[in-house]
Every structure is written in C-alpha cells, then in structure tokens.
C-alpha cells in the first residue's frame, strides 16, 4: 500500500471502482449509496483536504450527485439474505435526519407502515415474510437504523421505542452468552428439523455455545455480527440521552470487548469469528472497525483499551485493498451456507474478490477513520498506522 495515501484516498479508490457499477445488486446498493453520501458530507465538513495523495475531490458536487441519485429512486428493495424489503432507502432517511433532504413525510409514513404492517414472528420481531419466522441480523440493519432516523426526524419517542424493542428482542434470541457473540439468524421449526449438527461444528476459540432453540444458526458469522453492530451503533447515535441509551452503550461495549481476543495478530477478524481456522474476512472486520471508530469518536469506549486494536485493524484491512479499489477476502452472500449455517459451513464458504456486500462496510469504516483523524485528531495517519502495525 502506497504510504502517500490516507484513509480518504482508500475511500475514493473503492468508491471510484464500485460507485457507478450498474451490476451491483440492489441488495448491496442501498448501503453503498448510504456510505457514498455520508462520505461526501464528511468531506464537506472538513477544513482541509483529507487526501494525502494530493488529489482533489469536489465534496459538494459528490454530495449533490449522490443525493440526486438516491432521491430519484426510493422504491422498496430486498436485502442480502432475506426476503424482507427495506422500508425506505437508508440514505434518503439519513439525509432527512441531517436536514439534507425534504422527505420527512415519506420517512415517517414508511416507519408507520413498518410498525403497523411489517411482518413479525411470534415475539413481535420483524422477520422474513417469504419464510415467516426466519430471523436475520440483516433485518436489524434494515429496520432499526431506519426507525431511529424516523425518531430523529419527527421527535416522536414511539419510533425509538420500537427500534429499541426490536434490538433487545433480537439479542434475546440470537446473542450467545457463552460465546459472547451473535448468531446470524434463526430458522423456522420446519427448516431446523432438516439441520444435522456435527461434532466438527464446534469453533476452536469458543467451543462452548448456548443455543436456546434448535433453530438458531450455530455459526458465528463475522458479517452477521457486523449487521448487529451497525444497527446498534446507528441507534445509539440517534437516541436521546437517558438511561436507555446508557444501557445500549454498555451492550455495545460488551459486544466489542468480546471481539478483542478474536482479532488475529494481523488485525483481522475471521469469517467464523471464534475460529481462526476460517479465513480473515473483510466485511466483518470493517463493520467491527466502524463500530469501534464511532465509539472512539464519541468517547463511549475506553481509548486505552480499544485504540491499539482499532489501529491494528485499520492496517490489516488496508492490506486487503488494491490500488484499483478491489477488495479481497469478502464473505460469500449467504446467511445459511450449506443449508445449515454452522461454523464449518461458514468456514468452507469460499471468500470472494469484490463481493458487493463488502463495499459499504469498508467505505463506512474508512470514512469513520477520516473523521477520527482529520476532524477529531484521535488517530494517526494511515502511513503511520501501517508503519506501526506491520503484520506477521
């Protein structure tokens, strides 16, 4: 990696490769466009260019172009791993919450429709309407931030209440207190009956699992954990101050704390989080770094404890990015590989180059690093980080 490049340079390399690619699937494009417009807004707010390469970016023009593209097409689109639809374009809702778009009426109407008509399971959790009863942490990423943005836009507590209810309900079903990790989803009883678990499904670093129901997918998928962290981080950022926000901050700290021992010496987290026998995986690593970066920015995680792993992770992830914006070691797109979603199934699902759902978390984690370096002065430059954390 060229040491005359910084976090923003990496962002632009990735964005230039993927931002206007027509065959990016719709399920990946939603968060990619969110990452694009958020990056533009960050660039607009900086006093000087964050690009070490000397290139120039018209941040205002990038924002206007991105916003026009997003606001022109806001129809419902499906997610990555489930049949549920996005209730509203996340970038359009976020822009409205930042007073950058006049879509308040549309956002709150879509949020009301989600609360009243969204398909739910027996516990009132949003589920997969194509396969009723199926849960996925991706559903959290599709619904919880949107409800939080609706709460921010309207000032109405009921949207925040539903977002918190969904996150806590999902945690009760999918968070594993023994492994201290999330499982990525839940299969219906009919589907679970066909699952046969094998002794080799136990992960190496956390052999003890706590599966409250047979339908919980046993594998601890890095990207699945990332979806839960993304949902929680956006909710924390928007939620008004109070005891509930403090509780959620503690939940995120606990989640991140449990991930620190699972980071490998090169800074990466793996496809199966608690099994280094699986490959280092870029999207899960990026989602974790995004959550840690947001915590560092707001001072809600311990700097002494989390800063070194954060910097090591940025260095590690940067080494999986190429000069042309290519991204290596992205997880295959599937919540339940092998039809069972066990640790072995996830581990044997091959990594992909330029896997579309890897792009958004990489962009979000890098732009958070841009903020932490250029706006807050919290971290050193990428060149310094790469020199400090050389890997094995």
Model-inferred region functions:
Residues 11-19, 34, 85-98, 125-142, ...:
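Carbohydrate-binding/catalytic loop surfaces
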Residues 2-30, 37-91, 97-110, 134, ...:
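CBM-like carbohydrate-recognition segments
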């Amino acid at each position: 990696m060229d040491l005359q490049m910084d976090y923003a340079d990496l962002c632009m390399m990735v964005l230039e490769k993927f931002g206007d690619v027509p065959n990016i699937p719709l399920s990946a494009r939603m968060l990619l466009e969110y990452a694009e417009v958020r990056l533009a807004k960050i660039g607009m707010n900086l006093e000087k260019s964050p690009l070490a390469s000397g290139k120039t970016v018209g941040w205002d023009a990038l924002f206007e172009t991105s916003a026009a593209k997003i606001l022109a097409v806001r129809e419902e689109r499906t997610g990555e791993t489930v049949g549920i639809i996005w209730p509203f374009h996340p970038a359009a809702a976020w822009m409205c919450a930042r007073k950058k778009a006049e879509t308040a009426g549309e956002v709150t109407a879509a949020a009301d429709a989600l609360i009243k008509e969204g398909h739910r399971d027996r516990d009132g959790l949003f589920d997969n309407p194509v396969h009723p009863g199926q849960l996925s942490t991706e559903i959290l990423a599709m619904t919880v931030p949107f409800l939080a943005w609706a709460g921010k836009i309207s000032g109405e507590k009921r949207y925040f209440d539903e977002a918190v209810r969904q996150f806590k309900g999902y945690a009760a079903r999918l968070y594993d207190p023994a492994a201290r990790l999330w499982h990525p989803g839940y299969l219906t009883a009919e589907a679970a009956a066909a699952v046969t678990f094998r002794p080799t499904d136990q992960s190496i670093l956390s052999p003890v699992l706590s599966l409250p129901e047979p339908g919980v997918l046993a594998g601890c998928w890095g990207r699945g954990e990332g979806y839960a962290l993304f949902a929680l981080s956006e909710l924390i950022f928007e939620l008004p101050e109070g005891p509930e926000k403090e509780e959620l901050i503690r939940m995120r700290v606990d989640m991140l704390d449990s991930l620190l021992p699972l980071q490998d010496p090169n800074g990466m987290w793996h496809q199966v989080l608690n099994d280094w026998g699986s490959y280092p995986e870029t999207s899960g690593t990026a989602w974790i770094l995004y959550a840690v970066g947001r915590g560092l920015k707001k001072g809600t995680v311990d700097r002494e404890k989390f800063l070194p792993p954060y910097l090591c992770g940025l260095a590690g992830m940067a080494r999986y990015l190429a000069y042309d914006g290519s991204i290596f070691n992205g997880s295959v797109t599937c919540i339940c590989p092998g039809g069972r979603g066990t640790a072995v199934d996830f581990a044997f699902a091959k990594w992909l180059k330029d896997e579309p759902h890897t792009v958004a978390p990489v962009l979000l984690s890098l732009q958070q690093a841009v903020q932490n370096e250029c706006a807050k002065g919290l971290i050193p430059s990428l060149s310094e980080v790469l020199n400090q954390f050389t890997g094995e």
